[in-house]
A protein has these predicted regions:
Chain A
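Short, low-complexity N-terminal intrinsically disordered segments enriched in polar/charged residues
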Residues: 1-21, 26-33
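Surface-exposed helix-capping loop/turn segments at secondary-structure junctions
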Residues: 18-26, 74-75, 79, 133
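Short helix-to-loop capping/linker segments positioned immediately adjacent to catalytic or ligand/cofactor-binding
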Residues: 15-16, 71-78, 111-114
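A solvent-exposed, acidic/Ser-Thr-rich amphipathic alpha-helical stretch
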Residues: 33-103
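A beta-strand edge to alpha-helix "cap/lid" segment located at domain peripheries
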Residues: 84, 89-156
Length: 156, 156, 156
């Protein structure tokens, strides 16, 4: 588990850096061909209500999720983001699959450099090992901060 | 020390997840039978003033601390909490005891999903190894955010 | 790289603790004799504009940076600081030099214990190994939170 821990942390930190640096076209490369990416409110999760805040349930949808960001066809208020990923835990190992979780805090800053809390949540992931690489098969981002006062313009 | 570092981080992350998921009945299990748990303001600590914001100086008090939470007999404004534990350091090793510290940021979110800073502080811990397990013998939570505008309804 | 990762994290956490505990006289000891320490706005960095928010481009300037803090000759509103350093990554190794990055969140708390976001940024570092020690040869702190509503009284 020692190896997985450091590999997993690095995987999460690279993923986070990619988003913070706005390399959105690289984002789908963190997912397996068959994958799911969802943002859910903690309120719904705790009541076993299935409706997500947003959901991609195929790799094509993951690609589509960032297509407009990459092509700059989406008009929205630009913000800087910074991901603080901590409390990384391997919860279960099963052959080439890992169940893992981490807490994620995303701070947004506007173009005047004024910062505020944006996302407070937990990643609940199913990760697969593919050769030397880790890939996300299933990511559920459960957010405490579901009263988000901005549109979810960019991935978490 | 390498082993201790990862074990200690995992211990802290499990402890944090237990609180975030509101498994309060499990909280006393992180402490030794003879233990102390205190929340102190940084203001008092820096002036060597002993008064804590709250203190449990026996395991029974630790159990009592969460008894009302477990039994739902305490009425208070429900909040979600998320612990971000970082900067984990083993400061000293002495036989089966470790002195350790970590920084802790707790973000609270109300039932409408609006998030704010709740606790900003440092854990100053005396940890003992008991078989394969780590247990807290003494936890001092020194908080910078002692101007807490909520009651300390739940443990940190 | 495994060793470097834990050593580097510990180096960052010790550095952070030194600042949080206001041991400013120790701060220059984290730097090599020939060194650079800069705080830059993300706005400027992304446009390749060179002006920093503050810059020390010699060890003497680093010493000078904290001299007034150490001697208590500077009058400013005292604040507590707490560094949350996460997402630590070794980006490149080259002999005894490491390129590394980490995300840094600094929360400030005033003397009444009211906390707020202070610095949200990324360390971009050139670290050298000197015997058993790590030292900073070049630190660029790129801040998203460049609309800082306080003077940069203390180092980051």
């Amino acid at each position: 588990m020692t190896t997985h821990q450091q590999d997993l942390e690095r995987f999460y930190f690279d993923y986070a850096a990619g988003l913070d640096e706005q390399h959105y076209s690289k984002w789908p490369e963190y997912f397996t061909q068959e994958c799911r990416y969802e943002i859910l409110s903690r309120e719904n999760v705790e009541q076993n209500l299935p409706a997500p805040l947003m959901s991609c349930y195929s790799h094509g949808m993951v690609v589509d999720r960032v297509a407009m960001l990459v092509k700059n066809t989406l008009t929205y208020r630009r913000m800087y983001h910074k991901h603080f990923v901590s409390n990384v835990r391997v919860l279960k190992e099963n052959g080439d699959q890992l169940e893992a979780s981490a807490n994620v805090l995303v701070i947004q800053s506007d173009l005047e450099g004024v910062s505020s809390l944006y996302i407070v949540g937990t990643y609940l992931d199913l990760i697969v090992t593919s050769g030397n690489r880790l890939l996300i098969k299933n990511r559920r981002v459960v957010v405490d901060s579901f009263g988000i006062d901005n549109m979810l313009a960019v991935p978490v």
